[in-house]
């Protein structure tokens, strides 16, 4: 029995133990469940609170909107009020204290700003109760926000701050709400416009009283020159490469440096240090003309000494003027160049003449160089600035135009002027000229003289003298022209390598001969330049030549400026080196040792060929220019056939000469049919022949159709697909010139110029082009003149019946300068011609098939 009882007790205890464990587990699970429930409850409370806060915020936003609406109503009441709101305390004594209600609210999206806005109406000021015990809940809430955010309210004005400023000014008496809003909007618009606007130079109008007089004429004719008869002068000019003169009062040419009246130091520098012998043709005629104070247009081949022609008169004029004061930056002389390489070269020439004279300082301002150093040098004062147009515009617009003053500029030079216009610098040059005094002396040098440049010279220069050297052929006679016709790119590259190897073998033979002679014989230095048409071709040819064991100095605009400068210095320093470059250096690069120029890619214009071949045979040296032509480069063959002299063609291989003539004839025939045409560029000897032929054809057509209307004649020319592009050019030539009248009006002491350009009787397509919005906006932007349509169109045979009727259709151009009016008319004619030619081209394409 005891055993049974003991077993039962053990079972009970084990059962109780199991129940206790289950109870403990249940309590543990319950505790976890309670904890989770409590956590969920707290999360629900947070969500509830956030929703309540969101509702509170929405209510607050609604109150803000109501306050805004109330403010707008109050503003309108103030504006409609006949009497202005008094902002000063009333002079009448009142026993009741005036209480001002001030409503403060926040428009900002963040919590870092505070805006307080207060308005007081007339009724509030005069009829305010003595005590206002009622408190607006919104006032209390906003006041608390104001106290909390007071420390963060000292920032920049945002949208809400504008209202705060308005109220403060309103209470102080006297600023209208609209004025504040308008001023703020205008300031914002002005800032945006300033960021987006292009850099434009302000035109400066000088009165005669504020301009300091200066001397232009320094030339005294020597007895030897003055004793020459007119016949002797003609013979001398004929012997000096057939000098052609246009203009009146041109001085006689000189033949010796001593006839110019130069100082002893300058004579020693020219003859002994620089080793200049006799004068070149352009120097013989240009130096006396410029030293006489005349504006000069010099047209001469490259490498003919044009730099000295304007540099000596410039230095002489600068030294004769009053020195710069401490507060004057200068300059007195300005030289504009198309490329930084040419500008640096001119600056080096200036330095040669001024390094011994501390009274004349020169600064070179070009793109790609550090502007900080240029600004520092300009602030110290400088007498001469050599610059590219773009960088000079940048300097003129710095610090609102206060960095540099153009008031003292009396001498302006444009070197390689045709290249300046070819690169599109005409607007910049026009802006620069508007800042310079009108009585300046202006000199323009170029290798070619296209119509666009001629038009600019007429506007800017005063009674200029035009000096043309060797006008019948612009290619330097010291350049021996050759060519090779290839039938593939690989063959052309093989010819290039062969030419370089032949050149190296020739130098080796010459050097071996010199080694057998006296040791005093200098080593031959004959450099070569290879011109290509693009940056990619330049890099490709450079790598291929390097693989062939030929090292070159490669230069193009895609390389960093420092790398270009290092390669150029290496090319100048090393003997018999080879420069590989694009056409960017076809002008202005002066390396006298260059004896060979290889044109790897055929040039597209005659002017480009002139300047490319002009890199060799500098001065009195001789050189060779070899063009590598592909069999399908017909335009290059045409240019070569027109540029090469007869004796050069006779000396060629008969088969090569025959193939060149066939390619040239094929291109010329294609031009007549409209199949081919030369790229746009400056005209040369070959282009003049085309022009004369077109003029002859035009005269014949005019004789045959002299009784037809001009509009019918133009339509027939345009709609004739047989003549192709040649017809287009002829039709553009038949566009009638614009008839206009120029007037001058003086009102209130100010002078206004205006012109009436009559377009009613012009052909319909001309009227369309003249009155297009794009045309008018372009002219306004370029000249600053106002141009508007006036009158109405009258069909042919109809006229205004009386004075009360509107006049015939015309364009009214108004401006403050007569030159701007003339420029506007020229641009209008140019745009009309371009538009008509374009329309004619589209007509040809549409009727081709």
UniProtKB/Swiss-Prot annotation:
It catalyses: ATP + H2O = ADP + phosphate + H(+). A motif (DEAD box) lies at residues 415-418. The keyword Nucleotide-binding applies. Residues 287-467 form the Helicase ATP-binding domain. Residues 28-138, 689-730 are annotated as: Disordered. GO terms for cellular component: commitment complex; nucleus. It holds the Pfam family Helicase_C. Its main location: nucleus. A motif (Nuclear localization signal) lies at residues 90-96. Residues 89-102 have a biased composition (Basic residues). One of its GO terms (molecular function) is nucleic acid binding. It is an enzyme of class 3 (hydrolase). Present with 358 molecules/cell in log phase SD medium. This is Pre-mRNA-processing ATP-dependent RNA helicase PRP5. It comes from Saccharomyces cerevisiae (strain ATCC 204508 / S288c). The Q motif is unique to and characteristic of the DEAD box family of RNA helicases and controls ATP binding and hydrolysis. ATP-dependent RNA helicase involved spliceosome assembly and in nuclear splicing. Catalyzes an ATP-dependent conformational change of U2 snRNP. Bridges U1 and U2 snRNPs and enables stable U2 snRNP association with intron RNA. Its EC number is 3.6.4.13. One of its GO terms (biological process) is mRNA branch site recognition.
């Amino acid at each position: 029995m005891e055993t049974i009882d003991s077993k039962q007790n053990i079972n009970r205890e084990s059962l109780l133990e199991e129940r206790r464990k289950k109870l403990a587990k249940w309590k543990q699970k319950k505790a976890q469940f309670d904890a989770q429930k409590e956590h969920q409850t707290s999360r629900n409370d947070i969500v509830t609170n956030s929703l309540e806060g969101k509702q509170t915020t929405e209510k607050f936003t609604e109150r803000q909107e109501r306050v805004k609406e109330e403010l707008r109503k109050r503003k309108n009441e103030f504006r409609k009020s006949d009497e202005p709101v008094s902002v000063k305390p009333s002079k009448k004594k009142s026993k009741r204290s005036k209480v001002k209600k001030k409503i403060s609210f926040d428009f900002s999206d963040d919590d870092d700003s505070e805006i307080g806005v207060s308005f007081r109406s007339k009724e509030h000021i005069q009829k305010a109760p003595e005590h206002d015990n009622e408190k607006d809940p919104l006032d209390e809430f906003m006041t608390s926000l104001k106290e909390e955010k007071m420390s963060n309210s000292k920032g920049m004005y945002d949208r809400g701050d504008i209202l705060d400023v308005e109220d403060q000014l309103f209470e102080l008496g006297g600023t209208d709400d609209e004025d504040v809003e308008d001023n703020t909007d205008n300031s914002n618009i002005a800032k945006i416009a300033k960021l987006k606007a292009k850099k434009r130079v302000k035109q400066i109008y000088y009165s005669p009283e504020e301009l300091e007089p200066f001397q232009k004429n320094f030339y005294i004719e020597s007895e030897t020159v003055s004793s020459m008869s007119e016949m002797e002068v003609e013979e001398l000019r004929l012997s000096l490469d057939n000098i052609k003169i246009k203009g009146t009062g041109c001085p006689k040419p000189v033949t010796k440096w001593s006839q110019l009246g130069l100082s002893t130091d300058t004579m020693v520098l020219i003859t002994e240090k620089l080793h200049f012998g006799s004068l070149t043709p352009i120097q013989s005629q240009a130096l006396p003309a410029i030293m006489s104070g005349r504006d000069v247009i010099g047209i001469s081949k490259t490498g003919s000494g044009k730099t000295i022609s304007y540099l000596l008169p410039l230095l002489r004029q600068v030294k004769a003027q009053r020195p710069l004061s401490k507060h004057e930056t200068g300059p007195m002389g300005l030289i504009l160049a198309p490329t930084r390489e040419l500008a640096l070269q001119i600056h080096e020439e200036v330095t040669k003449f001024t390094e011994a004279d501390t009274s004349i300082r020169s600064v070179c301002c070009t793109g790609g160089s550090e502007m900080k150093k240029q600004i520092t040098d300009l602030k110290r004062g400088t007498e001469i600035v050599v610059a590219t147009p773009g960088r000079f515009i940048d300097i003129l617009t710095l610090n609102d135009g206060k960095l540099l003053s153009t008031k003292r500029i009396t001498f302006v030079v444009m070197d390689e002027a045709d290249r300046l216009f070819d690169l599109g610098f005409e607007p910049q040059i026009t802006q620069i000229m508007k800042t310079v005094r009108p009585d300046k002396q202006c000199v323009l040098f170029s290798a070619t003289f296209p119509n666009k440049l001629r038009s600019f010279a007429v506007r800017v220069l005063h009674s200029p003298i035009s000096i043309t050297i060797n006008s019948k052929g612009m290619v330097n006679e010291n350049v021996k022209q050759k060519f090779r016709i290839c039938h593939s790119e690989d063959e052309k590259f093989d010819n290039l390598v062969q030419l370089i190897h032949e050149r190296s073998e020739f130098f080796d033979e010459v050097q071996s001969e010199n080694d057998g002679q006296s040791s005093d014989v200098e080593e031959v230095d004959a450099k070569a330049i290879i011109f290509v048409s693009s940056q990619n071709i330049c890099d490709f040819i450079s790598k291929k030549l390097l693989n062939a064991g030929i090292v070159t100095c490669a230069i193009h605009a895609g390389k960093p400026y420092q790398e270009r400068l290092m390669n150029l210095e290496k090319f100048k320093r090393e003997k018999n080196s080879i420069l590989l470059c694009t056409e960017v250096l076809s002008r202005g690069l002066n390396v006298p040792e260059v004896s060979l120029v290889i044109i790897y890619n055929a040039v597209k214009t005659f002017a480009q060929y002139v300047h490319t071949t002009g890199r060799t045979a500098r001065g009195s040296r001789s050189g060779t220019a070899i063009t590598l032509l592909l069999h399908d480069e017909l335009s290059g063959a045409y240019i070569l056939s027109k540029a090469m002299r007869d004796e050069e063609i006779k000396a060629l291989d008969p088969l090569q000469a025959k193939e060149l003539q066939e390619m040239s004839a094929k291109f010329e025939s294609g031009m007549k049919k409209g199949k081919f045409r030369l790229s746009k560029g400056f005209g040369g000897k070959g282009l003049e022949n085309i022009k004369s032929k077109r003029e002859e054809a035009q005269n014949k057509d005019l004789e045959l159709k002299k009784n037809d209307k001009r509009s019918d004649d133009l339509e027939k020319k345009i709609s004739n697909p047989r003549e192709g592009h040649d017809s287009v050019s002829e039709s553009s030539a038949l566009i009638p010139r614009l008839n206009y009248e120029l007037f001058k009006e003086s009102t209130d002491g100010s002078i206004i110029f205006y012109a009436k350009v009559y377009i009613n009787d012009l052909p319909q397509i001309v009227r369309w082009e003249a009155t297009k919005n794009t045309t008018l906006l372009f002219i306004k932007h370029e000249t600053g003149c106002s141009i508007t349509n006036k009158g109405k169109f009258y069909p042919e045979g109809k006229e205004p019946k009386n004075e009360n009727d509107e006049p015939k259709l015309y364009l009214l151009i108004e401006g403050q300068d007569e030159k701007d009016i003339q420029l506007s008319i020229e641009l209008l004619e140019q745009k009309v011609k371009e538009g008509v030619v374009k329309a004619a081209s589209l007509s040809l394409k549409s009727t081709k098939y």
